[in-house]
Amino acid sequence: MAFQDQDIFIVFSHASLFLNQNDLLSLSLTSKKMHDMIAIPRLYSNIHITKNPVLRTNKWFLDGGKTYVSGYRSVLKTGDKNDIFLYDRIERLLETSHLKCIKQLTIDEDLFHNREEGLQLLQRLVNEITDLDVIESLDIKDPTLFELCSAKYYRLSSLKKRVVYGETGFDGIKLWQNFKSLKWQLPESLDLQNVIIPEVGVMLMKQLNGGELEIKDEAYSSLRVFEYFDSLNLRFKNLRRLKLNHVHKQGDGSATSMRLSSRAFKDVVNLSNLKALELEFSCEVDDCECDDDFLQDITGNLVSLTSLGFIEKTFTKKGYHYMDEKWDLVVNKFILNLPNVSKDLRLLSIRHDPPLNGKGIDTVDGNLLRRKKLYEKVLPKLTSLETIIAPTVLQSITSYEMYACDLLWNGCKCAFCSKYLPLFDKYIMNHQYFSTPDARYLDIIPIVFAAYTGKSLAKRFDPQKNWDLDLLQYAPEDTTWNFHGFERIHHFASYECYFDESSFEPLATIISHFFYPYMNYLIKILPNLRQTMLSGIYFSVSPELHTYETIYD
């Protein structure tokens, strides 16, 4: 019987990875042994502090494996009421005797309405955790909180994932042990010679063997880091995951603004061992094709790539159709030229950079048709693709008027949409937003409404702010929109407005229906597709049955 009991506990130990915190609490009540050996250690192992509760469902396991400490679950709530619940739950966490069980702790940004009191409480929590020095991953996304706790953070010896801000972050690197993940955030004016001395470089090469590196440069010139690494003859021969950002800016006289160049990059990183690559990039300079040249120079070396992410970043040409189309051409040409792309690529993420209100330049319908045909040519070749992540696809599509009108007037005719779409039509007819370029209020049109909707849905996943490739490792937050805010939205004085957060859930369902034709196409051309996330709408796909369903909407 002892062996049988041991086998049962092994099974439960593995199965508990898929249980959410409510299930783990239920499991802890079954027996003292189950409580002490499985439920409690698993419950405290990975804690994520979020402003809003996460969406729950029995259809998926995104909320499994983590304990979420969150605010008030209600459609209608105020910031101070949410603070009360979140503050109390963090205090209860501080009082527990199980803090030593915490191996991973993630603290999101802007958690509290009362920021000063919230930061004091969070600093207490971080101090307690760092004093124990057993944590393996401490992700503090609020820069102010990180600065308050940075001295203790950098002295932690057990971290497997590390974040470095600015110049002094590497000072204690000799004390670090066994870290396999590094996120380095560089200030624009950082002098690399003062930071990466040769012994630091040697330590990075050793520790990141088989690991991941993310470089986030405030100047959007991450390639300068690899040029400096090359000057020190540093070589990363076995990186598995890499993320960087680089923009060749229009009319920028900054010394840190530079063309995308692959020379040093290819010498420093052994691209043939990369499994995951995420690039935030663009070239905004007229008659320059450095982004295309860069990608074509590296594509032949990426023989092991299974996960690929692209993020468009623009400064002076946000919303310019021809900028977006050029970027799409560069990205899709790169994808087509990847070695064994049909056999190897499993995950693809593409995020565009649309304007807040969706209004762009040259966004006529024929231009979008060209962009759609481009993706229709490339996507069918990705026959092994299992996951598609497109965080801004709603805004990208509906910035073209015909498609925005389809959403409201010519789209889904089901009973649900037929009931609610006229209400949102009435919203549009009675609300305005403030246009800064025009210096006056303008009527909300379908393009603007769809863009605000996409931005609101993005709040489900935007607090994660790490890799887009990892967005499906987090449960989406239960967020809403009150149909005001953004660009000073207001309604006409003669109109009695009844739109608030309670109207958002039907709108999310309407958006999920809007994506049905796109999902019908994707499951037809991608035989191994299993999941997609389109602008905060999550779909699960059955490749065997060629069917799909929305998870939360």
Curated annotation (Swiss-Prot):
Chain's role: Non-SCF-type F-box protein involved in the endocytic with the vacuolar sorting pathway. Acts as a repressor of YPT52 by inhibiting the formation of active, GTP-bound, YPT52. Involved in the defense mechanism against methylmercury toxicity.
Question: Do you know what upregulates this one?
Answer: Expression is RSF1 and RSF2 dependent.
Query: Transmembrane segments in this chain: where?
Result: none
What does the UniProt entry say about where the protein is found? Cytoplasm; Nucleus; Cytoplasmic vesicle membrane
Question: Which species is the source of this protein?
Answer: Saccharomyces cerevisiae (strain ATCC 204508 / S288c)
The domain of life for this entry's organism is: Eukaryota
Q: Gene encoding this chain?
A: ROY1
Please provide one cellular component term from the Gene Ontology annotations of this protein.
cytoplasmic vesicle membrane
The Gene Ontology biological process terms listed for this entry are:
endocytosis; protein targeting to vacuole
Q: What is known of its domains?
A: The F-box domain is required for interaction with SKP1 and defense against methylmercury toxicity.
Subunit annotation: Interacts with SKP1 and YPT32; SKP1 is required for the interaction with YPT32.
Give GO terms: molecular function aspect only. GTPase inhibitor activity
Residue ranges constituting the F-box domain according to the UniProt record: 3-49
Q: Which UniProt keywords apply?
A: Cytoplasm, Cytoplasmic vesicle, Membrane, Nucleus
The entry's other comment says:
Present with 3080 molecules/cell in log phase SD medium.
User: According to Swiss-Prot or TrEMBL, what is its membrane topology?
Assistant: Peripheral membrane protein
The identity of this protein, by name, is Non-SCF-type F-box protein ROY1
Keyword Nucleotide-binding appears in the UniProt entry: no
Disulfide-bonded cysteine pairs: these are none
